[in-house]
């Protein structure tokens, strides 16, 4: 299990990380006009997608592996500290309304627990034991996936989570923003998006955080596409929990079917508001219970259910 390094050792570690590098050409950035600083920052941010693009093969391989586990009932679990942990919690929290996932299907763990979302929890990121306890509380199984997220790639909480998860047979992914990181080495799927030195020295909530957000977007979104949570580029598993989402549900059914508003309302009523079921009712001319059965038999994949209904 990873141990917390002493301060001199940690300082020497940080000096080797590109995300911590000092940029002398920016030493007087505080003397520049605001617009010039904004242009500099925007230019820095524009380099991030290219850094992510270099790692697309590794990202795609991880997604395919995650989808296999989740299709067997496994969970997607993010583990990180500070900004990295908050980004994992954010991505996990968006999955239920977007893809109608169960509350425990995509989970974000942040070192120090929920309070760490808004305040710093002293020493939490330095504890691999805390990561192990957090995973034990979830009753981790071999069908689950743990994604450790850390800009430095050395955060003990993230590395510890991946090491422990892998020891239990779970799938592991390590997302870091430095080369040759301990986190990527500990994981079955290492993804190192090298974003380089930050505009503000060591402030990895900037380019590194942006890169992490882009990769987490891909991990969750494309995994859900693989699991049949979309129909084309339509969010057919959206959970209509408010008026905006109810309106979006009607629009999705309209885009998928071209049906009249009255027919859409009848189909949504017949399927208790389930968008995917309503589309099947309209396109395959089946009733609500039949649509639900066909989708269940097709593992939730609308195209497969449609083929079964029409074939």
From Swiss-Prot:
Q: Name one Pfam family in it.
A: GKRP_SIS_N
InterPro entries in the record: Etherase_MurQ, Glucokinase_regulatory_CS, MURQ/GCKR, SIS_dom, SIS_dom_sf
Catalytic site residues? 94 (proton donor), 125
Under the GO molecular function aspect, what terms does this record hold?
A: carbohydrate derivative binding; carbon-oxygen lyase activity; ether hydrolase activity
Record's catalysed reaction(s): N-acetyl-D-muramate 6-phosphate + H2O = N-acetyl-D-glucosamine 6-phosphate + (R)-lactate
For this chain's UniProt record, which GO biological process terms are given?
A: amino sugar catabolic process; N-acetylmuramic acid catabolic process; peptidoglycan turnover
Q: In which pathway does it act?
A: Amino-sugar metabolism; N-acetylmuramate degradation
Under which EC number(s) is this enzyme classified?
Answer: 4.2.1.126
Signal sequence, renumbered to the chain: none
Q: Where is the SIS domain?
A: 66-229
The entry's keywords: Carbohydrate metabolism, Lyase
Q: What class of enzyme is it?
A: lyase
Family named by the database record = Belongs to the GCKR-like family. MurNAc-6-P etherase subfamily.
Function in brief: Specifically catalyzes the cleavage of the D-lactyl ether substituent of MurNAc 6-phosphate, producing GlcNAc 6-phosphate and D-lactate.
Additional comment = A lyase-type mechanism (elimination/hydration) is suggested for the cleavage of the lactyl ether bond of MurNAc 6-phosphate, with the formation of an alpha,beta-unsaturated aldehyde intermediate with (E)-stereochemistry, followed by the syn addition of water to give product.
Record note on quaternary structure:
Homodimer.
Protein name, UniProt field: N-acetylmuramic acid 6-phosphate etherase
**What species is given as this protein's source?**
Streptomyces coelicolor (strain ATCC BAA-471 / A3(2) / M145)
Classification of source organism: Bacteria, Bacillati, Actinomycetota, Actinomycetes, Kitasatosporales
Q: Which gene encodes it?
A: murQ
